Structures are given as C-alpha cells and as structure tokens.
C-alpha cells in the first residue's frame, strides 16, 4: 500500500517538499487530482485497478452492511464517499434508491458510468465537510466505508452529525475505519509514521479507535449504538436515529 503512496505522492502538487503545501483538509483538490483518470481513481479506492478485486471487496462490504444495519428493498440509501461506485453497484439492485455522494466530480463521473444500467441511482457532489445538498429526513440508510481514514477527525464527526439530519426517524447509520487497537491497525499506523513528515501526502490514511467512533455517535444523538472490531483490522460503528 505505502509503496504505491510513495511512488505517486507527487501527483497532487509536485515533487519533494511541495507535497506538504496541500493540506489534508483540501479534500476536493486532493481527490479530484487523484482521480484524473479512471485507473488512478480505482487505484486510490482499493490499491489496484483489478476489477475482480473491486467486485470481491464490494461483495464483502455488502455482507457487512446486511449483517449490521440491514438492507431492505424499500430503503433509500446514501453513500458518503462513493468513489467509482464500487459498493453502489451491488446495492442498487436490492434497494429502492441509491445516492452516491463524493467530493470529486471525476469519481462521480466514473461511478455514473459503472451504474449506468440502473434507473434508481443519483449522484451528489459534496464540499468534503458535510451533506448540505441532501434533503433532511430523506434517507433510510447512510453508510461510509473506507473513507474515514482519509478525513480529519473533525470532518468524521461532521459527517456523522449531518447524517443524522439526513436520516428519517429510525434510519440506520454505518461507518468504519482501520482500528488502532488491532494488529493490522498498529502496523498501518507505524508504516505511516515511518514516512518523513515532509513527504506524507495529504491523502495518507489515518486510524480510529472504537472509543472515538462511540463518542461521535453518542454526541451526535444516535441511539442503539453498536461499535465493534472485526477481522483484527476494522472498527465499525452502527446506530439508529
């Protein structure tokens, strides 16, 4: 993973210490640059352009969503950070509507191409900090997977808080991140730390803890909160409005 990060770190703003001039918080600039080509977009979504890997990981995420928050045929579902439509492709056939949200117009273009055969999908470009374009109480499920690692902690909470506004009463939320408390998460943390500060790209992944996710869900006013660690890697937070 970090071999890839080191190799392509200069794509955003040039080589050397110029990388540090683009802050992590400039999500739109960062992710628009990273998704200039569809191949690049897929690489940053999953680490490679392999379509079989893309489909397999989407299937795994679908199982995780089904077992945690449940997916119903009558659900209106929204994804925060939909990327190239990896998960949307397996969700759209089994829900009423699927809305893909992303900070990058390029990502949304590729996602629309991937999901072009479905009439129940739409796409929304975000600022990178909230869900303002989405109507209040318009969704039954809001989820975000493999996205929080790229966000600062304040913006993780922003999305969790605004997702509650977007959800209907009884609506379900799912979020995840790599957990610092796991073996995989600690190695991930150490590999990131080993990159010299001046060379750390703004999209570098950062971890969470179960306590962090639980605090966010509680502070945002959710109920039926469940936080778990799975596969010695991921922390998952689920809750109900």
Predicted segments with their positions:
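Class I (Rossmann-like) S-adenosyl-L-methionine-dependent methyltransferase catalytic domain
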Residues: 1-69, 73, 84-133, 151-158, ...
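Class I SAM-dependent methyltransferase core
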Residues: 79
């Amino acid at each position: 993973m970090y071999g890839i990060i080191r190799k392509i770190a200069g794509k955003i703003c040039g080589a050397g210490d110029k990388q540090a001039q683009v802050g992590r918080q400039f999500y739109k600039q960062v992710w628009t640059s990273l998704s200039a080509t569809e191949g690049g977009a897929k690489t940053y979504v999953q680490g490679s352009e392999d379509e079989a890997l893309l489909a397999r990981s989407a299937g795994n995420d679908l199982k995780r969503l089904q077992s945690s928050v449940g997916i119903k045929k009558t659900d209106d579902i929204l994804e925060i950070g939909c990327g190239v439509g990896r998960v949307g492709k397996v969700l759209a056939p089994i829900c009423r509507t699927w809305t893909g949200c992303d900070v990058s117009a390029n990502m949304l273009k590729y996602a629309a191409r991937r999901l072009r055969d479905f009439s129940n999908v739409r796409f929304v470009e975000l600022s990178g900090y909230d869900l303002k374009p989405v109507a209040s109480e318009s969704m039954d499920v809001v989820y975000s997977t493999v996205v929080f690692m790229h966000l600062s902690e304040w913006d993780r909470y922003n999305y969790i808080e605004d997702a509650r506004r977007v959800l209907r009463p009884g609506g379900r939320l799912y979020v995840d991140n790599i957990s610092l408390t796991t073996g995989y998460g600690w190695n991930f943390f150490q590999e990131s730390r080993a990159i010299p500060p001046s060379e750390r790209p703004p999209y570098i992944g950062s971890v969470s803890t179960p306590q962090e996710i639980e605090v966010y869900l509680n502070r945002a006013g959710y109920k039926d909160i469940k936080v778990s660690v799975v596969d010695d890697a991921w922390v998952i937070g689920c809750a109900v409005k």
